Amino acid sequence: MTRTSKWTVHEAKSNPKYFTHNGNFGESPNHVKRGGYGKGNWGKPGDEINDLIDSGEIKTVFNKTRRGSNSQNNERRLSDLQQYHI
């Protein structure tokens, strides 16, 4: 009787080495450092579009005016009805 703990009690299953030994804690192992602004400041995918718009090579795409809501249209119609005289 040299052992006091039973062999039937097992510890929790450990995480795979892939997740425990690569990168920082709580990060996926294939995480890109600084969100893509890596060595040489090469930027994130899609940043080149803003550069092309600024240089004038392509036109701006998001130049639509904001649509009014239905409540604004309804208010205008009600005010027109109230101002209508027979």
Swiss-Prot record:
Subcellular location(s) of the protein: Cytoplasm; Nucleus
Keywords: Cytoplasm, Nucleus, Phosphoprotein
CC per GO annotation: cytoplasm; nucleus
First-listed, main subcellular location of the protein, grouped into a coarse class: cytoplasm
Disordered: annotated segments: 63-86
Highest taxon of source: Eukaryota
Complex formation: Associates with ribosomes.
Role this protein plays: May be involved in inhibition of the reverse ATPase reaction of mitochondrial F(1)F(0)-type ATP synthase.
Family note: Belongs to the STF2 family.
Further comment: Present with 504 molecules/cell in log phase SD medium.
Protein name: Translation machinery-associated protein 10
